[in-house]
Design a protein with these regions (language model features):
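Conserved AAA+ ATPase small/helical "lid" subdomain
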Residues: 183-209
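P-loop NTPase catalytic phosphate-binding loop
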Residues: 1-89, 95-176, 182-185, 196
């Protein structure tokens, strides 16, 4: 799972666009699929017509999120059964024996989703999905503007963390869960990510279709 935290305009949506563009260029829809819940800038609908894209859900279609979670539950249950039949314990081993697309579920501004009635109803289930899905080739990407938008129990499920243009080094420390002694320059797309327990400076790139 990937957690991206940054102030408004720091490049969170740009990160998602670049990641999805890169993945869809490298992998077919048999290898990689994604679902988007866009409660931010509504710029991610550009991916709607790609064969890799299962759905783009926004505020006016938020009720569809319930159907999405039902689908994801079915996928995980089917993969549990398949893994047992293949006698494997994780997605990497199973994918060597059978074509199984890696699935990424993207929440751009997860706090916006959680403020909806549908989001409030599904919050506890979302915790379950984060904990149980990654072993079966289903991962999540959350973007948040502040560390307090999701609780610590939820944050602990995210092993990959990226911080973009936060207010001070203490916020970087909180979100990355590693001690940060410096702040990156205030440049578009500049941030810090946690790598093997160390904070490393990074630079995002914008894709050009």
């Amino acid at each position: 799972h990937i957690l991206v935290c940054g102030e408004s305009g720091s490049g969170k949506t740009t990160f998602i666009k670049t990641l999805l563009y890169s993945m869809t260029r490298k992998h077919s829809s048999d290898q990689f699929q994604f679902y988007i819940l866009d409660f931010s800038s509504h710029l991610l609908k550009i991916f709607r017509n790609l064969p890799h894209c299962g759905a783009v859900i926004e505020e006016d279609t938020v009720e569809q999120s319930m159907e999405l979670f039902k689908l994801l539950t079915t996928i995980i249950q089917e993969r549990k059964k398949l893994f047992s039949e293949l006698e494997v314990s994780n997605y990497s081993e199973a994918a060597k024996l059978k074509k199984l697309p890696f699935i990424l579920v993207v929440f751009d501004n997860v706090a916006g989703f959680l403020q909806t009635k549908a989001g409030q109803k599904q919050y506890d289930m979302l915790q379950y999905y984060l904990k149980s899905s990654v072993n079966y080739g289903v991962s999540y990407l959350f973007t948040i503007s502040h560390v307090n938008e999701i609780n610590m129990r939820t944050r602990q499920e995210f092993k990959q963390r990226i911080a973009l243009q936060l207010r001070d080094r203490y916020e970087y420390t909180d979100i990355l869960n590693v001690k940060c002694m410096y702040m990156p320059p205030e440049l578009p797309g500049r941030g810090i990510y946690s790598y093997e327990g160390r904070p490393l400076e990074m630079q995002l790139a914008m894709f050009a279709p």
